[in-house]
Amino acid sequence: MKVAFVMGSDSDLPVVEKGIKTVQDFGVEVVVRVISAHRTPGAAEEFAKTAEENGIGVIVAAAGKAAHLGGVLAAYTTIPVIGLPIKSSTLDGLDSLLSIVQMPPGIPVATVAIDGAENAGILAVQMLALGNAELKEKLKVHKKAMADKVAAKDAAVAARFC
């Protein structure tokens, strides 16, 4: 299964690339597209309707400002959609966050923090890992590596003051 990263504008790419790299680090294939919910709604509908048959298991929808992309995609598919609010000059991304998180009943969009591309990638991998023991093991290794880093930093700081 693949993870699709769909962004409303190519200006979102510097943020989205962090999520793409995260997913690729787990050995998961990605599909990356620029589709606007407002300027190319037909393309958004077509992408969402054909995502599953194209091997996509999770969609990460990145958008700023009005940020309707995730909701539009979720309306046309049954696969999970993760909304990634992008910080824009307007309201520092709060407008994006609220646009994504306030979905009507029956059309959920999981939402991560503003510019939280790495967590969007991790969440997408966790969703795929529900049916994939190899991915689940990679996630366990990843979490242990994070814990080991914190333990090393803890030891270094403690050693400075003991």
What are these regions (language model features)?
Residues 47-85:
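Glycine-rich phosphate-binding loop
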Residues 128-162:
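Glycine-rich phosphate/pyrophosphate-binding loop and the adjoining helix
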